[in-house]
Amino acid sequence: KPAYLHPAAKVPRKVEAHALLSPFDNLIWFRDRTERLFDVKIRLEIYTPAEKRLHGYYVLPFLQGETITARVDLKSDRQAKVLLVQAAHAEPDARPDTAEALAIELSRMAGWLGLERVQAVGKGDLAAPLSQALSKM
C-alpha cells in the first residue's frame, strides 16, 4: 500500500532512539500500518482470557532504532517499589543487544514511576536474557 512523505521532510540516515510504546500510541494503534511498517502484529490482549493470551495483558512494544525488537508485559508493585516484567518476548528482528537496551529503558521507566528497581519474573524467550542484563545494572 502506498505511504506518503512530505517533499520537504528530511529523513535521517539512521535513527537510534529507544522507546517503550503504549498500545494506544498512534504508531501502534493503527494495526495495519504497524504491520506494514514493522512487520509485526501487535494485539491488545486485555479482553482475551488469560489462558489464551500470547504475550500478556497490557503489552508494550519496544522500539529499538527503527525496528520493534521486543514486547513486554509490565506490572508495578508500588508497595515493594518494583517494576515487574511479567513477560518479555523477542521479535524475529531482535538485535543481539536488545536485552541490554530494553533493560536500560525499563530502568528509566521505573525511575519515572518512582520505583527503585526492575525485576524480570515472567515468561517469554527474552525473560532470561533480560534478567541477566538487569542484574548487571
Please place each PLM-identified region on the residue numbering.
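Long, charged, low-complexity, helical-prone intrinsically disordered regions
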Residues: 1-137
